Structure formats: structure tokens, C-alpha cells
Swiss-Prot record:
GO terms for molecular function: ATP binding; proton-transporting ATP synthase activity, rotational mechanism. GO terms for cellular component: plasma membrane; proton-transporting ATP synthase complex. It is found in: Cell membrane. Produces ATP from ADP in the presence of a proton gradient across the membrane. The gamma chain is believed to be important in regulating ATPase activity and the flow of protons through the CF(0) complex. F-type ATPases have 2 components, CF(1) - the catalytic core - and CF(0) - the membrane proton channel. CF(1) has five subunits: alpha(3), beta(3), gamma(1), delta(1), epsilon(1). CF(0) has three main subunits: a, b and c. It is a peripheral membrane protein. It comes from Lactococcus lactis subsp. cremoris (strain SK11). This is ATP synthase gamma chain. SUPFAM superfamilies: ATP synthase (F1-ATPase), gamma subunit (SSF52943). InterPro entries: ATP_synth_F1_ATPase_gsu (IPR035968), ATP_synth_F1_gsu (IPR000131), ATP_synth_F1_gsu_CS (IPR023632). PANTHER family: ATP SYNTHASE GAMMA CHAIN (PTHR11693), ATP SYNTHASE SUBUNIT GAMMA, MITOCHONDRIAL (PTHR11693:SF22). Keywords: ATP synthesis, Cell membrane, CF(1), Hydrogen ion transport, Ion transport, Membrane, Transport.
């Protein structure tokens, strides 16, 4: 019985240490989440302004824009930019988006020549490579608060591959941050660029004279616009990742406390049984005398 009590005490001590670690990780994730939410909010304000300016410019002439990034072409191949984390301990964050991507690929494509993957995050890259799915570009090691410079390579790669007609449409697949407890898997079509589905209003720039001309400006602006929208999805996904990490660590901490309570009850019962047995043995010994 003594050994059993020692084992229980060891388990309690070990679980307490684990709960301290997960509790600390929860606090770290909460701090990262707060910063990420502020970053995402600030970028959203910027993105809305960029979108308004671009929409105004596109709509500043009765003639439709002829820029290749806005022209729908026959879809022979689809590009998927899949955003995941580099590590675990984020609950169902990675599995949610990866399941969504795989399900969509199976519905839309009959063979691997019809799509390609660009992976932002080691978990996604390893997931697809383990299943022999071609990954044309991988970016790992993103910081907790990613700057555009960090993701410029993969964002530019996605836009350039589309411009080179290596694929005919691009979807960005990521977890959208709703709140600290909820995120939702999204697959947003980024290319070709379309403003119709957003319900944008007629441009205010129609009364302005453009220099050198609208098409020349759009040739420079639209790739940058697409890159900024993709970057916005990355910022959103990173916020959802921190929220998932905080929730996962909170759950782990709560579970540890529950285990500690159960072990404490088990320890008290075992100790009571041990004392009762000792008293019984003493009484039995005294009776024998």
C-alpha cells in the first residue's frame, strides 16, 4: 500500500508541473493573441482603403479593365495557397483547414495535374508531401507577428505563377479568426481579381484625369493589390493560430487540474485504507495477547 501511495504522490507532483507549464503557455498565447488582433485590425483598415482605391480606379472608365489579373480564363489548373502552423499544440487548427482542402480537391479534381499546392507552414507542407502531393513552394518559420517582408517570397511567387499561367486561378486556404474560441476554415478565391462579388460601388475617381493612363497604373497596382489581400489572409490565419493555441493550453490546464483532483481523492482513499488496515492489525495483535 505504501508503494501505491508513493506512486500516486509522484503522479500528482508530475501533473502539477505539467499544469504549470500549460498555464504559462496559455498566458503566452493570450499575449500573442492580443498583439495579433491589434495587428489584424490595423491591417483591415489599410486593406479597406487599398480596396476602395483599386475599385475606384478599375471603375473609372466605362470600358472594362483589360488587365490579365482580372480576366477569367479557362481553368486547366488550380493553385492552392494553404496556411498552417509550423508546430502543434494548437488543437484542431491544422486538421480543420487540411481536411477542408483535401475534401475540396477530391470534389473538384480527378488527377494531380489539375492542381498545385503552395504551403505556408511546416505542418501543411509535411502533410501534403507525406501523401505524395506536389508542393511547388514551401515557406516555414514564420514569426508570431509576421511582416510582409517575411511572406513576400511566397506571396510574390503565387502572383507570379498566376501571371505566368502556371495555374489559372488561386485559392487561399486558411482559418479565419472569429473570436478566441471560434475559427472557421475558409477557401477564398484571390485570382483572378474580381470586385463584383463584394458589392463595391461605382468609383469616385471617374472625375479625375489619370496619368499616364488607367491600364498602365493597373499593371502596377493589381499585383500589389493581390499581394496585400493574400497577406491579409496570412495575418488573419496567424491570429486564429494564437487563439487556437491559447484555447488548447487552457483545455490542457483544466484537464490537468481535473486529474490532480481525481488523484488527490484516490490518494486520500488509499491513505485511509492504509490507516484502517494498520489499526485492524494492531487490534488483532492486542486481542491475540
Amino acid at each position: 500500500m505504501g508503494a501505491s501511495l508513493n506512486e500516486i504522490k509522484t503522479k500528482i507532483a508530475s501533473t502539477k508541473k505539467t499544469s504549470q507549464i500549460t498555464g504559462a503557455m496559455q498566458m503566452v498565447s493570450a499575449a500573442k493573441l492580443q498583439k495579433a488582433e491589434s495587428h489584424a485590425k490595423a491591417f483591415q483598415t489599410y486593406a479597406e482603403k487599398v480596396r476602395k482605391i483599386t475599385t475606384d480606379l478599375v471603375s473609372s472608365d466605362n470600358e472594362p479593365a483589360k488587365n490579365p489579373m482580372m480576366i477569367k480564363r479557362e481553368v486547366k489548373k488550380t493553385g492552392y495557397l494553404v496556411i498552417t502552423s509550423d508546430r502543434g499544440l494548437v488543437g484542431g487548427y491544422n486538421s480543420n483547414i487540411l481536411k477542408s482542402v483535401i475534401s475540396n480537391i477530391r470534389k473538384r479534381h480527378t488527377n494531380e495535374s489539375e492542381y498545385t499546392i503552395l504551403a505556408l507552414g511546416g505542418t501543411g507542407a509535411d502533410f501534403f508531401k507525406a501523401r505524395n502531393v506536389k508542393v511547388s513552394y514551401v515557406l516555414r518559420g514564420l514569426s508570431d507577428q509576421p511582416t510582409f517582408e517575411e511572406v513576400r517570397a511566397i506571396v510574390t511567387e503565387a502572383v507570379e505563377e498566376y501571371q505566368a499561367e502556371e495555374f489559372d486561378e488561386l485559392y487561399v486556404c486558411y482559418n479565419h479568426h472569429v473570436n478566441s474560441l471560434v475559427s472557421e476554415a475558409r477557401m477564398e478565391k484571390m485570382l483572378p481579381i474580381s470586385f463584383d462579388e463584394k458589392g463595391d460601388e461605382k468609383a469616385s475617381l471617374v472625375t479625375f484625369e489619370l496619368e499616364p493612363d488607367r491600364e498602365t497604373i493597373l499593371n502596377q497596382l493589381l499585383p500589389q493589390y493581390a499581394e496585400s489581400m493574400i497577406y491579409g489572409s496570412i495575418v488573419d490565419a496567424k491570429t486564429a493560430e494564437h487563439a487556437a493555441g491559447m484555447t488548447a493550453m487552457r483545455t490542457a490546464t483544466d484537464n490537468a487540474h481535473s486529474v490532480i483532483n481525481d488523484l488527490t481523492i484516490q490518494y486520500n482513499r488509499a491513505r485511509q485504507a492504509s490507516i484502517t488496515q494498520e489499526i485492524t492489525e494492531i487490534v488483532a495483535g492486542a486481542s491475540a495477547l
